[in-house]
Every structure is written in C-alpha cells, then in structure tokens.
C-alpha cells in the first residue's frame, strides 16, 4: 500500500464523499526524467571528480533538478562539460531502467549506493540503470534512459563548506533553454550588425574602438 498526501487547490469535498484521484501525467513524466537524470549525474560526478562525491541533498520537480554533493572546490568548466557529456552519453545509449525490491543485505551485495546516514528497513527498492548506476531509491523513474531526451547543466555553485550544487534541465526544459540561448545569441548578432560567423571578432573590434575613444576623451579632458 502507498499513502499520498495531497492539497485541495480548487473546489471542495466532505468527509465521506467518494472521489477519484488521478495523476497529472505530464508532471509525473517530467519528474521521472529529472529524477533518473539525477542518478546518472551522481555517477558521472564520481567518475569525473572522484569517489569522495556523495549526495548531500536533492530536489526534483517537473521543471528542473537540483543536486547537492560533497566536493572541496568549484568545478572547472572542463569538468562540467565532461559530466554533462557522460550523462548525455548514457541517455543516448537508451539503457533500460530496472527496479528491484530486495532484502537490505542482498541489496548491499549488488553494490547499490545508499544515502549516508539514511535509515533503511529490512527491504529496499534498488533502481538499476544497466551497470552504470545502482542506487537505493523509492522514487518515480523513466523506464529507459533514452526517454530523458537530453541533459543540460545550467549552474554550479557552493552552498556550504565542502558542498557544491548543480542545477540542471532535461527533455523539453533543456530544449527551451537552448532555444532561449539561441534567441539571445541572434539578438546580439543583430545589435552588433554581425553574423554568427564573425560576431566574436565584431564585438572584440567594438570593444577596442570603445577603449580607444575613452582614451581620447580622457586625453582631451586633461588638456
């Protein structure tokens, strides 16, 4: 049996009324994508940064995911790119996601990761993504990593001493992020009267010109 806690946001009902509850299919699917991506992310972080990485907190919503982990310094741009590439590689492999309910001792023998200081019962649910990721977890997941579609890290920051935070998007959220970046990039090209091929050169030229003009202004002020 599974118990759910809900909140009435519209309408009303009374004790004794018979009601039918349904899950918001889209929110459930998007949440599952972000949750499964979090498992892939943790393993990718351990590959890139080292086995000292442990989960220190997590938030999964239909719109995004947030993952806190133990690490002693800010991640470099190269490290972030490597982690992102590994996660997307596992998504592209379309790995079946399997769940098993095992006795706690049998679950530990599989090598599945457990949350530090978390108390578990006699049986636990293990979520396996091929040989890449095995974790104790009771949450909702996709049935295949390919259903996540895509993964994009949008920020990496510190939240406490020795704890870093990654925020990321998957699926349609990642696609919308890329479209927004593309629009901003095109707007910059238009403002600079440049093309995507020469916009960096054009902006560098404009900056040099501004610097030169500012020097001339300062020179005139001193006369």
What are these regions (language model features)?
Residues 1-223:
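A glycine- and charged-residue-rich anion-binding loop/surface
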């Amino acid at each position: 049996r599974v118990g759910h806690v809900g909140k009435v946001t519209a309408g009303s009902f009374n004790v004794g009324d018979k009601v039918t509850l349904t899950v918001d299919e889209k929110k459930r699917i998007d949440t599952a994508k972000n949750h499964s991506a979090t498992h892939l992310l943790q393993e990718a972080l351990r590959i890139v940064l080292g086995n000292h990485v442990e989960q220190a907190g997590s938030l999964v919503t239909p719109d995004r995911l947030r993952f806190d982990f133990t690490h002693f310094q800010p991640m470099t741009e190269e490290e972030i790119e490597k982690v992102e590439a590994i996660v997307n590689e596992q998504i592209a492999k379309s790995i079946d996601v399997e769940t098993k309910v095992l006795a706690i001792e049998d679950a530990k023998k599989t090598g599945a990761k457990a949350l530090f200081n978390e108390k578990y019962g006699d049986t636990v649910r293990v979520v396996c993504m091929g040989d890449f990721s095995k974790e104790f977890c009771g949450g909702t997941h996709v049935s295949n990593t390919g259903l996540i579609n895509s993964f994009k890290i949008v920020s990496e920051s510190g939240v406490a001493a020795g704890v870093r935070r990654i925020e990321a998007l998957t699926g349609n959220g990642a696609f919308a992020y890329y479209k927004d970046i593309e629009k901003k990039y095109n707007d910059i090209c238009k403002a600079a009267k440049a093309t995507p091929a020469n916009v960096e050169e054009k902006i560098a030229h404009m900056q040099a010109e501004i610097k030169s003009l500012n020097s001339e202004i300062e020179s005139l002020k001193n006369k």
